[in-house]
């Protein structure tokens, strides 16, 4: 019985985030293919949010009695953090320098233990802090490019990406702290439903209406949205049910590694090849991959 319990815990804390990371890599490939149809990221994000809302509804089967109305502000705050983080991240990636924004977004991993401490959830073991810092540096190395941008765009990217990373980190921490009060099953679908309603703020950013999306673009767009939804279910369920948000985020950070591997292996066939892989970039990304695996090993074996 103890062995079964340990296997379930390992699956929840490590397996689900790893599955989410791999699913994210698949969605990244389809996102690149979708971008080829000229669909801006705001419409893509709205579609992904709607599909994610649907994917979270089966959690109602695990729900018990709903809490008092006085607690319904909690999923609203978490939903707001999700949408704010999404807007800031997409703004940084679309309007700023990707070579700056992508590595800075990796700071989410180290923001998580900081917010846990600030919100009174207690201090994490030293090994977890070291793993979070190592994974953060690894993500930055994995996102290395030789691109150079102007100073103004660099500062803009730095501020928006860091703010987006902080919002998503606080989102994860609040899911862990507040979902137990709701019996977990109810909190997740309510929160995602609220975030989808809040996603209507994206409408002003649409360059064209949703109905103008080409019919031939829907297979890749719907596939990307489905994978995004499934990876969200996996990582959020891990945080909500097993309450190891710092560990889950370190494992989930491998999504960048799987994305790079997927682009390298399959990008040519899906029209999503990476032209930035110079010898210097390859060396730094390899170092990042090794550091990331070392950070995960620290969590598992120490």
Residue ranges and their predicted role:
Residues 37-43, 88-104, 180-187, 234-256:
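Structural motif at transmembrane-helix junctions in multi-pass transporters
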Residues 12-20, 47, 54-88, 105, ...:
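Loop-to-transmembrane-helix transition segments
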Residues 19-84, 134-137, 187-209, 254-267, ...:
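Transmembrane alpha-helices of multi-pass small-molecule transport proteins
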Residues 85-127, 144:
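Membrane-interface helix-loop-helix junctions at boundaries between adjacent transmembrane segments
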Residues 51, 56, 107, 113-117, ...:
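Hydrophobic transmembrane alpha-helices of multi-pass small-molecule transport proteins
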Residues 1-42, 150-186, 193, 221-241, ...:
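Glycine-/small-residue-enriched transmembrane alpha-helix faces in small-molecule transporters
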Residues 30-33, 37, 91, 95, ...:
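Membrane-interface helix caps of multi-pass small-molecule transporters
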Residues 2-7, 52-70, 114, 118, ...:
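Membrane-interface helix-cap regions at the ends of transmembrane helices
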């Amino acid at each position: 019985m103890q062995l079964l319990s340990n296997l379930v815990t390992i699956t929840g804390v490590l397996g689900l985030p790893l599955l989410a990371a791999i699913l994210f890599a698949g969605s990244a490939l389809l996102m690149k293919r979708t971008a080829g149809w000229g669909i801006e990221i705001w419409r893509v994000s709205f579609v992904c949010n709607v599909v994610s809302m649907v994917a979270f509804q089966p959690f109602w089967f695990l729900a018990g009695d709903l809490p008092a109305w006085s607690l319904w502000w909690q999923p609203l705050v978490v939903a707001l953090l999700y949408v704010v983080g999404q807007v800031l991240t997409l703004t940084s990636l679309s309007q700023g320098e990707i070579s700056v924004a992508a590595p800075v977004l990796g700071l989410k991993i180290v923001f998580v233990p900081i917010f846990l401490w600030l919100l009174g959830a207690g201090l994490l073991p030293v090994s977890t802090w070291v793993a979070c810092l190592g994974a953060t540096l690894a993500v930055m190395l994995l996102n290395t490019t030789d691109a150079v941008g102007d100073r103004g765009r660099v500062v803009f990217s730095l501020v928006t990406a860091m703010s987006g990373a902080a919002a998503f980190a606080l989102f994860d921490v609040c899911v862990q702290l507040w979902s137990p009060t709701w019996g977990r099953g109810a909190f997740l679908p309510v929160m995602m439903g609220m975030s989808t309603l809040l996603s209507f703020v994206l409408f002003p950013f649409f360059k064209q209406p949703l109905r103008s999306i080409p019919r031939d673009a829907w297979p890749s767009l719907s596939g990307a949205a489905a994978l995004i939804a499934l990876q969200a279910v996996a990582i959020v369920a891990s945080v909500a049910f097993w309450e190891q948000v710092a560990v889950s985020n370190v494992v989930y950070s491998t999504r960048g590694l799987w994305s790079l591997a997927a682009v390298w292996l399959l990008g040519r066939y899906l029209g999503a090849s990476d032209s930035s892989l110079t010898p210097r970039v390859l060396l730094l990304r390899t170092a990042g991959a090794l550091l990331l695996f070392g950070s995960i090993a620290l969590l598992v074996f120490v």
